[in-house]
């Protein structure tokens, strides 16, 4: 199932928080919206699944207009927002069974589907316990299971691993990979570089509500930065700038020092950096943080 958005804008008062976003989610694809907090990811996310009305623009899921044919669209979409919104008065199993009722899935069919999802999520042992006994990671897996109760074709995940510890994040990533293998399309918002790079087939980079670039993660890194960068501290900016400009490469201040892209023929530049009286010098693979820093001048953590 395809999703297309054309020229989405959202104003709050006179302030435009999303400006002209156009995207295409292809069948079976994971499309990531990557940007810092405040970039407009969640607002864009809301407009795409119908939770936020755009000031201008069109969102189409298959043959349906998201904001005019909401009933048909809701049967196709599964949504995981940043809030868990689980019912604390119900058990883990009951949360799934009663949520299934929203989609007219009842009786034995609802029970069977709930148990199937609990098994897929590794939550069978918790079926008859209340949700407040679950860890943060288990709650997120339950929320994802709940979003799948009606066999959606497209699943929306808004910052799905925020607040989770590293082990819980890894476990949730495996759930998303399984979801893709089942044939679902996934739209993911995140401000975690590693999450975006690992999960997404394609990325849209958002800054202040504007798409600043897009493409496959590896292609973005290779095209905008190159294979490697150097990080250096303890030298004057003028020295780094002079060396980078002489080599025709990108550089920026980063933390207490500077980051400099290393071209494929980097031996002279790397040797020149090594010759400087720096307090720290290292080289590493380029990543999406570098891409975002070059495109916007801002770190993803900002």
Residue ranges of each PLM-predicted region?
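Conserved catalytic motifs of ABC-family nucleotide-binding domains
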Residues: 151
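Conserved ABC transporter NBD signature motif
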Residues: 57-68, 72-73
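Conserved ABC ATPase signature
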Residues: 130-137
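Conserved ABC ATPase "signature" region
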Residues: 97, 101, 108-126
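ABC transporter nucleotide-binding domain
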Residues: 173-263
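Catalytic Walker B motif of ABC-type/P-loop ATPase nucleotide-binding domains
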Residues: 155-158
């Amino acid at each position: 199932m395809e999703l297309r958005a054309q020229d989405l804008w959202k104003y709050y008062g006179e302030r435009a928080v999303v400006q002209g976003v156009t995207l295409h989610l292809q069948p079976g694809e994971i499309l990531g919206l990557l940007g810092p907090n405040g970039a407009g990811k969640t607002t864009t996310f809301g407009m795409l699944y119908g939770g936020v009305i755009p000031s201008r623009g069109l969102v189409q899921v298959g043959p349906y207009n998201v904001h005019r044919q909401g009933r048909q669209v809701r049967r196709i979409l599964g949504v995981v927002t940043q809030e868990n919104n689980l019912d604390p008065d119900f058990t883990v199993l009951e949360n799934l069974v009663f949520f299934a009722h929203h989609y007219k899935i009842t009786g034995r069919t609802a029970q069977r589907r709930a148990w199937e999802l609990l098994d897929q999520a590794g939550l069978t042992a918790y079926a008859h316990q209340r949700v407040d006994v679950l860890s943060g990671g288990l709650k997120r897996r339950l929320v994802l299971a709940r979003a799948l109760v009606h066999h959606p074709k497209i699943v929306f995940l808004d910052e799905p691993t925020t607040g989770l510890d590293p082990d819980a994040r890894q476990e949730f990533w495996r759930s998303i990979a399984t979801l893709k293998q089942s044939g679902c399309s996934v739209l993911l918002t995140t401000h975690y570089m590693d999450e975006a790079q690992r999960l997404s087939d394609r990325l849209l980079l958002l800054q202040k509500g504007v798409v600043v670039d897009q493409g496959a993660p590896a292609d973005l890194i290779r095209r905008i930065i190159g294979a490697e960068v150097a990080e250096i501290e303890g030298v004057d900016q003028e020295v780094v700038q002079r060396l980078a400009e002489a080599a025709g490469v990108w550089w920026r201040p980063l933390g207490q020092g500077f980051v400099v892209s290393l071209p494929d023929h980097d031996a002279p530049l790397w040797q020149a950096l090594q010759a400087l009286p720096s307090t720290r010098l290292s080289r590493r693979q380029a990543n999406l943080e570098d891409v975002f820093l070059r495109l916007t001048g801002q770190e993803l953590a900002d």
